[in-house]
Amino acid sequence: MMHRVCFFLLVVFYECISFAQTVSSYVDPLIGTKGMGHTFPGACVPHGMIQLSPDTDTIPHNVNGVYQKEVYSYCSGYQYDDNSIVGFSHTHMNGTGHSDLGDILLMPTVGVIQLNPGIKEDSRSGYRSTFEHKDEIAKPGYYSVFLKDDSIKAELTATECVGVHRHVYPKGEGNLIIDLNHGIYNYEGKVLWSSMRVENDTLLTGCRITNGWARFNQTYFAISFSKPILRYGGKEVGQQSVYKGFWRKFNQQYNFPEMAGRGLCCYFVFDCQDNAPLEVRVALSGVSTAGALQNLREETSGFSFDTLRKKAEEKWERALSVIQIEGDEDIMTSFYTSLYHTMINPSLYMDVDGTYRGIDGNIHQVKDFTNYTVFSLWDTFRALHPLFNIISVQ
């Protein structure tokens, strides 16, 4: 009996030590988010297409042709010293000296619907919300925060091609803002076109085309909801497009199944009386809405938020375990956070079926390789890519 007890205690002790010493537990995604660190705290998997993270302001790249120098501190969308969150967008650069992206921003709200982000000096001037760092959790593959203004808990995780949200609203009706005009390093006219189609009461599809660092960058999406939409609407908030077609005879800003324009901002209202969280899954594709739908189904169908979070955390643990070191906690945190930051970009740029849009604008099929983007080769050839040559399993 004594042998069994000792063996049981040894196993428990070993498992506790193993859990406490997972290398991913040393990663702090908030490191580098202050000043000019140009990192973000949100959820992603190693080299995934999705980098789902909070953006804390909307400073434009230029105003009337004049560069706004403050924008440089927002290369990754998040600035630690800010006290409000504009929303959660699905693409981010990490550690770069220039920026773009911030595609497909979502923000949960309650009460009066506002279709502008407002200003950070007054969070009530738009759909943004204040927050505190004590209510924020950032781990590899997971991010959560409490949005104070509307008392909403927001949680994020990700697969390679899908950003997964879980929002807990107060009892009543909950709103979800989807801003296709938002962007990082944004400016008037950067969004060339955007569209939104309500496929049914739990599914949206659409696209956003931008003219930024990447010229004519096409981002297609499919968005699913765990609750049916009660009502919805939207309008152009960017440069106004000219439309003289038949649909102008209808009110396209309320419960209209298709919307399009240079910079759409839309809202969707849900019944949250039961306190059950609203889960939102946003799949991206550079190819088509059909590609986004396939990414959505193949990567997330049948899996709960918690299961997808666990899968993301396991992917990070495997990736980071390629190098094992020993040291005190500060050294371990510094090392594994740095290693974590090397594994965000380059990022995946192809669908689950292996199709991708090339720089020629055409659709290609991969053959025995994985297609990536965001290489930043003028900086990374010196150290990052030699590191990949050492630690890559391929």
Across the structure, where does each feature detected by a protein language model lie?
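Accessory carbohydrate-recognition regions in carbohydrate-active enzymes
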Residues: 21-394
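Bacterial Sec-dependent N-terminal signal peptides
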Residues: 1-21
